[in-house]
Amino acid sequence: MEMLISIITVVLNREATVEDTLRSVLAQTYPHIECIVVDGGSVDNTVSAIEKYVSLFEGRLKYISEADSGVYEAMNKGLRMATGDVVGYLNSDDVFKDRHVIETIAQTFEQPEIDAVFGNVLYRRRNGERLLRRYSGSHFNPGMLPYGIMPPHPSFYARKSCYIKSGGFNTNFRIAGDYELFLRFFQKERICYRYLDLDVVVMRFGGISNRSFYSVLCGNSIELMKACRINGIYTNWLMLFSRFFMKVGGVIRWLIVPHYIWRK
């Protein structure tokens, strides 16, 4: 039996971008994809945009539209709806880098010992084609988690059994629920993972976790500290703030090497 991959998109009032996201999923060369959209009760034309794609997916798209308490409750809803062997999340204003991304990911999961894979994420301007930076997962190891460093979540795919075993996302977090889940995956469950040198997703810069200077400098660190504490993992403010110097280094590397224009 072919491996089914569930791609979950959480959306709220994204009529301007959600169609790009759905087209990106529809264009994938890997045929065994289940697309799940969890709408949080949009008041614009988001649901109408989603409904236009139901027939195009030929039974492979499921969606729900109802109010929720936040993004992580919505992500858990999508997880419960998923019937795939492997699960990944694609933000409602992001797209896959190319048509072959999921095919490459599926090939890696043919190795039964692999629990999860992740690659790289590209950032571009919200209303432009120029790429701003590349967030690579190549240097990640679980020992970096207490420093606030984690794999790029939009590039992360894991077996659904891992999510079930860990209990899914902790809805008490506003912006660090993915980090807290990674603490459980890598530090407690000790999942077997593989880094792929693959640009998985192109993100529009400005999501909830990097929208403002305050959230980057203060809000994120407060939640990261809380996540470590509830999981019994030692960290401190100095360790968490050191990640900003690492991020600056990544930006500098991006600025001094040739980069390019991304086109859909």
Each model region followed by its residue ranges:
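Catalytic core of nucleotide-sugar-dependent glycosyltransferases
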Residues: L198, R211-L238
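Short, conserved alpha-helical segments within structured domains
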Residues: G177, N220, L240-F244
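Short, charged low-complexity intrinsically disordered segments located at boundaries
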Residues: V54, Y135, R211-L217, V251-Y260
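Nucleotide-sugar donor-binding/catalytic module of glycosyltransferases
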Residues: M1-F213
